[in-house]
Amino acid sequence: MPLNDNFVYCPPQEPLVLVYEDDDLVVIEKPAGLLSVPGRLPEHQDSAYLRVLARYPQAKITHRLDMATSGILMFAKHRDAEVAVSKMFQARTVTKHYIALVQGKLDGEGKVEVPLITDWENRPRQMVHFELGKPAQTLYQGLDYNAETDISRVLLTPITGRSHQLRVHMQYIGHPITGDKLYHPEPARSALKRMALHASYLAFTQPLSGTAVEIRGQVPF
């Protein structure tokens, strides 16, 4: 949740977009501004999970996206599927790609490998800490660059799944994600009124059926 005590939660009300479903799994596209799971306060209950639960009463969330991040979010329809998907994520056999707009010219390919830890004095911020942080790795690939706005479009592939990993790693290498009010509060030159980070791709072998699944979402920026 944002650090600002004056934060008012106003989640988007458009229906969730269903992008994949089988006997065990359901995958939706979460809009930016919607929590993945309910918050502690009554006014923070509206979330992707509760909306999915209304249609699939046994659904379990398998991973999360930050409120400001949009994109592909997967749920298990029942307990056996939840356990199987959890093992799949632990084994790192799921491929996830994100598209982001970042400040500055970032071209070529590279890897960010710096450990992360919660910044307890400024929660929910995370920070780089080489002594106490947990290992975190992110691959990046520059896709294009807009010289007029000084903004690059990049493909991000998280190898690990630390909280705020992509956001902190991009900030660390000097290319913060545009619109990120937590890690890049300066006025961004992007015309977007949101953080430019979208979970665009998910690929895995369905753990119960053995079917190869590849899901591509529509990037809204």
Regions found by a protein language model. Name each.
Residues 1-25, 31-35, 148-149, 163, ...:
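Pseudouridine synthases involved in rRNA/tRNA modification
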Residues 1-137, 144-148, 196, 221:
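RNA pseudouridine synthases
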Residues 79, 159-160:
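Loop/turn elements at beta-strand to alpha-helix junctions within RNA-recognition modules
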Residues 103, 156-159:
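A structural micro-motif recognizing beta-strand termini
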Residues 143, 157, 205-207:
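A generic structural motif
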Residues 149-156:
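Short, solvent-exposed secondary-structure boundary/capping segments
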